[in-house]
Amino acid sequence: MNIKTFEFYLFDIEGTTTPIEFVHKILFPYSVEKFDSFFQSNLLEKEWIEKLILEGKNDTTYSGKLSDSAFDLSEYCKHLVSLDRKSGILKEIQGRIWKSGYENGELKSSMFSDVPSFLKKIQASKKKSAVYSSGSIQAQKLIFEYSDFGNLTHFFYAYFDTGVGGKRESSSYSKISEQLGVAPEKILFFTDIKEEADAAKEAKLHSAILERPGNYPQPQHSHFKISSFEGLNP
């Protein structure tokens, strides 16, 4: 796969740079464990609480009680995690909880071993890297700052979350292209999900799908398929 023609390399996190197992067996359970104490400590601003309550009241999948009590808010967040819901409010709360966990040493993020060397290659070739994940920008930065390969944040030019839109919507990738100031054809997006790659392609980006250990099998597709960043020369 020749990737030298691209100027920007856009990375998903879960299943691409970081094992799915780390996200689902370490990060998610950690946040669930800490929801109670987080809300009991009154660490969330009133406007966020109101947004969370409103989301819950409009959520047809939830039948529990909703109020501004720590218990109710915690229970609803646990419900969202159980559904793997890409809720912006949930991601904000999780990001704050994870920040505390990383800073006090309870968390350290896991990275595929080929990631640091590939990021170095991109930087050495005068190209640029960016991140697009459903996790909040704060959570993205934490994963790369507290990785088991040290702080990798200096390799990234920009971070994008669902503030630009959902990852299965082509308009999100168009916005990213515009904000980066580079033609979409000059961006290569790495992901592990076919529907995300399809959306990027619709916006005229190129995509490569990672087939990592632990990743979910994808429907048949025509995107580039790779199992590692090893051997790729930007």
UniProtKB/Swiss-Prot annotation:
**Source species:** Leptospira interrogans serogroup Icterohaemorrhagiae serovar Lai (strain 56601)
Query: Which GO biological process entries does UniProt record here?
Result: L-methionine salvage from methylthioadenosine
Q: Which gene encodes it?
A: mtnC
| GO molecular function terms attached to this record | 2,3-diketo-5-methylthiopentyl-1-phosphate enolase activity; 2-hydroxy-3-keto-5-methylthiopentenyl-1-phosphate phosphatase activity; acireductone synthase activity; magnesium ion binding
Known function: Bifunctional enzyme that catalyzes the enolization of 2,3-diketo-5-methylthiopentyl-1-phosphate (DK-MTP-1-P) into the intermediate 2-hydroxy-3-keto-5-methylthiopentenyl-1-phosphate (HK-MTPenyl-1-P), which is then dephosphorylated to form the acireductone 1,2-dihydroxy-3-keto-5-methylthiopentene (DHK-MTPene).
State the similarity comment.
Belongs to the HAD-like hydrolase superfamily. MasA/MtnC family.
Q: What class of enzyme is it?
A: hydrolase
Q: How does it assemble?
A: Monomer.
Coiled-coil stretches noted in the UniProt entry, renumbered to this chain: none
The domain of life is Bacteria
Name under which the protein is recorded? Enolase-phosphatase E1
Pathway where it operates: Amino-acid biosynthesis; L-methionine biosynthesis via salvage pathway; L-methionine from S-methyl-5-thio-alpha-D-ribose 1-phosphate: step 3/6; Amino-acid biosynthesis; L-methionine biosynthesis via salvage pathway; L-methionine from S-methyl-5-thio-alpha-D-ribose 1-phosphate: step 4/6
Where is the region Disordered? Answer: 212-234
